[in-house]
Amino acid sequence: MNIKKIIAGLALSMLMGSGVANADWGDVYYCQMTNSLGITVEGEIERYKPEKFQFKLDQTKNAMVFGSTGMFKNEVFELVIGRTWPSQEAWNASDKYSMTYFEFGKFLFTRNGSLGITSLSANCDKF
């Protein structure tokens, strides 16, 4: 067997295995918003003070379950079946008015409603 194939195989196995043990159901994430803004129905842009928040990845509820403080106080975001890979630290959640995307510690959220649009980004760490 050629040395290049061995090295390529080892590198591939390390890459594939590196994220698998890093995340799973039951993990708790602590997040700090990097941007938070809204657009009113009149088209006015409003910038909000970035907040901290936390959530747990709950397998029983198939959801992101948020803590008791902050913008997402006690909210439950149901994960999208077929677009949820906790072991790879990547998932999507959505409902009638909002969409959430999470991958490798990056959190993106948008909500549309009768009062306008809310959009935010955050960096999250697992503890």
Where do the protein language model's features map onto the residues?
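Bacterial N-terminal signal peptides that target proteins for export
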Residues: 1-8
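Bacterial N-terminal signal peptides
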Residues: 9-17
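Sec/Tat signal peptide C-region and signal peptidase I cleavage site
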Residues: 19-23
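Short, solvent-exposed loop/hinge segments that bridge or flank secondary-structure elements
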Residues: 25-63, 100-102
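Short, solvent-exposed aromatic-acidic interface loops
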Residues: 34-38, 67-74, 114-115
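Contiguous, well-ordered beta-strand patches that form the walls/edges
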Residues: 61-100
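Short, exposed beta-strand-loop hairpins at the edges of beta-sheets
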Residues: 99-117
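Edge beta-strand at a domain terminus
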Residues: 113-127
